[in-house]
Amino acid sequence: MKQVDVIVVGAGQAGCAAAYDLASAGLSVLMLDSHAATGHKPCAGGVTEKARRLYRFPLDSVVRETVSQMQMSLYQKLETPFTADTPFCLMTHRPELDQLCRDQAQQAGASLTIVRHVSGFHSHGDGIVLTVDGEQIGARYLIGADGAHGAVRRLAFGGGARHGAMAIEGLLSREHCNRYPQTTFDFGAVRGGYGWLFPKGDHVNVGLYIRTQTGGKVDRHALADYARQRLGSDALTHVQGFPLGTWGHKQRLAAGRVLLVGDAAGFTEPLLGEGIYGAVLSGQRAAAAILAGNDVAADYIADIDRWRSELRRVHPIAAIFYTTLPISFGVLKHGVRRPLMTGYANGLTLVQSKRLFFGARFQ
């Protein structure tokens, strides 16, 4: 039976972040992934400034747009520019971003195996054994970075699929667009959520996001309608729907030698569905706990608690925002626009921006 120090199931942003740090420290790391074979994983690909600061290596080679201004609208009307003095987001194409991170993790010493199915798991005193495509692999630790519907959470902790939020996206070639948009958020484009337009040079990433508690619906027809309304064409390719894990404030994150990170841990921010920051952060924190070698599960839970507290505070904000959109958009537009954008450009989270600028003179 093959034996390694750490198995990381999932070679996306969370998994690669963990694998990079672990392998850089000299541990033997095996990444297992199915999406890496196809090269496309659903994700809008926006890397916020707070996320960019976490990476151990430059992202320049995969940056398609640098964003310091975006448009926000209510029901596709009342378009309002939101501007920061410095860039607050980098637009990447997710397959290219993932490939860069996999390459960096492998250069650090991690190995990658493309798999079809993780079907079994059991733990023992010195580690875990994972059954993958009918074969067993042993490790001292297991990191589940395989998404909101991932196998590791179900096998190690039980419970079925969870739906904190849903999104659907597609790519529209620039030649099919009647205009090339700025980065755009259209609140109310779908009930209980928003539509987005993320320009990427040769194409625009078009998507819809909803919080599932609101009863809204996203599907191919809704996405095609939105693309026609905003860009004059529904010639979308690579259309994919996907669940987002937004339950990290109450998810069981670790037990013994198993740690959950990224969407598998529910670390996506629920207001806008931004998941890359929580993914990279949790992957790095999981690696740090393993490298410290003490009470790994307890150390990881304690170390990631600040982000869990952020998520806990954002949930009621998101609920109020989407259920009172005409009022909340007005507050966003006339009240917190400037401090929010300044905070994001300085790498702050939503709650940190609120704390820093509470009582400031708003634009």
Q: Which role does the model predict for each range below?
A:
Residues 49-100:
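A conserved beta-strand/loop capping segment in the N-terminal third of enzymes
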Residues 20-42:
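Glycine-rich FAD pyrophosphate-binding loop
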Residues 11, 104-233, 250, 266:
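Predominantly flavin-linked oxidoreductase catalytic cores and closely associated redox partners
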Residues 1-14:
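Beta1/beta-strand and adjacent pyrophosphate-binding region of the FAD-binding site
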Residues 31, 144, 261:
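Generic enzyme active-site microenvironment
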Residues 288-363:
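C-terminal helical "tail/cap" subdomain of flavin- and related membrane-associated enzymes
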Residues 120, 214-289, 294-295:
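FAD/FMN-dependent oxidoreductases across multiple families
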Residues 6, 28-29, 142:
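Hydrophobic anchor at the start of a short beta-strand
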